Amino acid sequence: MAEQHWTGQLDLTVFNNGESSKARNIFFEKALKVLRPIYLEQSPVPTFYIVNVGGGYLDGDRYRVNVNLEDNAQVTLTSQGATKIYKTPNDHVEQYQTFNLSNQSYMEFVADPIIAYENAKFFQHNTFNLKEDSAIFYTDILTPGYSSNGQDFTYNYMHLTNEIYIDNQLVVFDNMMLSPDKSRLDGIGYMENYTHLGSAYFIHPDVNQSFIDDIYVAVADFQKQYDCRIGISQLPTHGLAVRILTKRTQIIEEILTRVQSYINQTIYHRQINFLRKY
């Protein structure tokens, strides 16, 4: 098998020193970079900004991200800007992200939108390896980019897979394929006349149906205020999945922020930090 040549790769390990979480074993090269951690509002939880220094994903790009959390470590990961997938006439873009969480660790990954432009082909594979008592909050936002004919869905496809393991047992496999060439994305069962899709997972030992019901109450007013649809489902483990359909990125961000705020206040007894990107 030929050796994989990465356009960008990144490795990061976070540990708890008894007072706060710190980073070690940081490695990155080529088109991926991680900035020095920021402790927003004097929080003991570091925030890392992951940067694509090339400004966008191009034809044939391959990316690898590996994040490890040791016992009791906590971290917030985010991007510095949107992930832009430009046209890929010859080869698609691939991104592989692996997150390994040890006992009682917690990772928040709140990324900016993935924007697929005309004739873009994008594949992303995420693997989450958790312990029974570790936790994740992870989000994705998918949006169509500019097209020359003004249509909404002119990318070739966006294919995202998520595998979640708890104590080495596969508990969630989410395989999402958005391919305008093969399906009418504006039809029933797909985007249903919406253009933007938001997703989130929250895995934590305290998640049950009552907790999910409370989150739904916390976000219910958005469906009255905006043209959007929100679905929250219990996963076949102690976790939940959120799906949002709308026509604006900002609406998805508001809803996911409300979900994240409820989680942090209820379970971790703290406020979320404003990530100050703009």
From Swiss-Prot:
<keyword id="KW-0996">Nickel insertion</keyword>
<comment type="similarity">
    <text>Belongs to the UreD family.</text>
</comment>
<comment type="subunit">
    <text>UreD, UreF and UreG form a complex that acts as a GTP-hydrolysis-dependent molecular chaperone, activating the urease apoprotein by helping to assemble the nickel containing metallocenter of UreC. The UreE protein probably delivers the nickel.</text>
</comment>
<dbReference type="GO" id="GO:0005737">
    <property type="term" value="C:cytoplasm"/>
</dbReference>
<dbReference type="InterPro" id="IPR002669">
    <property type="entry name" value="UreD"/>
</dbReference>
<keyword id="KW-0143">Chaperone</keyword>
<keyword id="KW-0963">Cytoplasm</keyword>
<comment type="function">
    <text>Required for maturation of urease via the functional incorporation of the urease nickel metallocenter.</text>
</comment>
<dbReference type="GO" id="GO:0016151">
    <property type="term" value="F:nickel cation binding"/>
</dbReference>
<dbReference type="Pfam" id="PF01774">
    <property type="entry name" value="UreD"/>
</dbReference>
<protein>
    <recommendedName>
        <fullName>Urease accessory protein UreD</fullName>
    </recommendedName>
</protein>
